[in-house]
Curated annotation (Swiss-Prot):
Residues 1-23 are annotated as: Disordered. The chain crosses the membrane at residues 61-81, 85-105, 111-131, 138-158, 169-189, 237-257, 279-299, 327-347. One of its GO terms (cellular component) is plasma membrane. Mediates the transport of urea driven by a concentration gradient across the cell membranes of erythrocytes and the renal inner medullary collecting duct which is critical to the urinary concentrating mechanism. Facilitates water transport in erythrocytes. PANTHER family: UREA TRANSPORTER (PTHR10464), UREA TRANSPORTER 1 (PTHR10464:SF5). Disulfide bonds: none annotated. The gene is SLC14A1. The keyword Transport applies. This is Urea transporter 1.
Length: 384
């Protein structure tokens, strides 16, 4: 006689077992497409090289927002196409060229397969297209895009040699260096590749508070995330948030919070409303909030609050740097995010709940937190 009530219930209700199995299969199926899709990467190892290369490129496109997920890469590519197909094309060209260059330079294969040798060039391609004064479909631009994309693995390798001594990531420093170098070399008056003229503020902006639109502020939240890829379309920003959500809900939450804090910082400094609506106050703080809020620091309440502080600090630093760099005719790009986040990662504290992740163990926030909890448990049990 079987006294197991579960077994009796399943025998009497024949449809119970399939439903239970279905509920179990759904989280398992989601596990294959969320996170960093490690199982898919393992499955690709014995597949044709061309198929693997496509995976590396898609991961490179998504790595701009710290995501190593090819499906997220596809969604982000869709968002770029919604914004501007020409920018999407330049971003893809940059990613492909940079990844190929990394292969030719025999860079670390695990970094290449994770998309870490492509994401800087994704931004280089997109932003070179945006800052080009020749407009869309100026096909000659693909040559300097390819040339500058080839410098990204060189910058990455050189910076990694220095920053690895402190176990720090290179972030988008290679992108900032490559784009700043290109825009400085060409400028607005170059006869072949003129760029958009960047000028400092020379008069008091006309800010009329009664004209502030709540709807526009609401739209500026996804636009702030979209501006990470140089997109001012709220639909594109919404797609990017969905791509981040697919990989990590915690990252998506911090991306949105970071953009919101950027808006608040802009309002606190009485910034021109059009700049806030365009998301120019949100993208650096969004990246900073993701980086500290679970990506490069294990997520706890303490690091969550630290991420909020870093996002605000980044937004104010962005305002400062944009004024300074405009004097020499350059945009601030993601310099504020890189400098502010590196500063926060160099923070030393005796608080055990503020735990900086070893770079070799960084994956995505949920997995990082599991590693942190296991590491803490081993530390507690060690003396025993």
């Amino acid at each position: 006689m079987d006294d197991n009530p579960t077994a009796v219930k399943l025998d009497q209700g024949g449809n119970q077992a399939p439903q239970g199995q279905g509920r179990r299969r759904l989280p398992k199926a989601l596990g294959y497409i969320t996170g960093d899709m490690k199982e898919f990467a393992n499955w690709l190892k014995d597949k044709p090289q061309a198929l693997q290369f496509v995976d590396w490129v898609l991961r490179g496109i998504s790595q701009v927002v710290f995501v190593s997920n090819p499906i997220s890469g596809i969604l982000i590519l869709v968002g770029l196409l919604v914004q501007n197909p020409w920018c999407a094309l330049n971003g893809c060209v940059g990613t492909v060229v940079s990844t190929l260059t990394a292969l030719l330079l025999n860079q670390d294969r695990s970094a290449i397969t994770a998309g870490l040798q492509g994401y800087n060039a994704t931004l280089v391609g997109i932003l070179m297209a945006i800052y080009s004064d020749k407009g869309n479909y100026f096909w000659w631009l693909l040559f300097p895009v390819s040339a500058m994309s080839m410098t990204c693995p060189i910058f990455s390798s050189a910076l990694n040699s220095v920053l690895s001594k402190w176990d720090l990531p290179v972030f988008t420093l290679p992108f900032n260096m490559a784009l700043s170098m290109y825009l400085s070399a060409t400028g607005h008056f170059n006869p072949f590749f003129p760029s958009t003229l960047v000028t400092p503020v020379t008069s008091v902006p006309n800010v009329t508070w009664p004209d502030l639109s709540a709807l526009q502020l609401l739209k500026s939240l996804p636009v702030g995330v979209g501006q990470i890829y140089g997109c001012d379309n709220p639909w594109a920003g919404g797609i990017f948030l969905g791509a981040i959500l697919l990989s990590s809900p915690l990252m998506c939450l911090h991306a949105a919070i970071g953009s919101l804090l950027g808006i608040i910082a802009g309002l606190s400094l009485s910034a021109p409303f059009e700049n806030i609506y365009a998301g120019l106050w949100g993208f650096n703080s969004s990246l900073a909030c993701i980086a500290i809020g679970g990506m490069f620091m294990a997520l706890t309440w303490q690091t969550h609050l630290l991420a909020l502080a870093c996002a605000l600090f980044t937004a104010y630093l962005g305002a400062s740097m944009s004024h300074v760099m405009a004097v020499v005719g350059l945009p601030s790009c993601t310099w504020p995010f890189c400098l502010a986040t590196l500063l926060f990662l160099l923070l030393t504290t005796k608080n055990p709940n503020i735990y900086k992740m070893p770079i070799s163990k960084v994956t995505y926030p949920e997995e990082n937190r599991i590693f942190y909890l296991q590491s803490t448990k081993r530390t507690v049990q060690g003396p025993l």
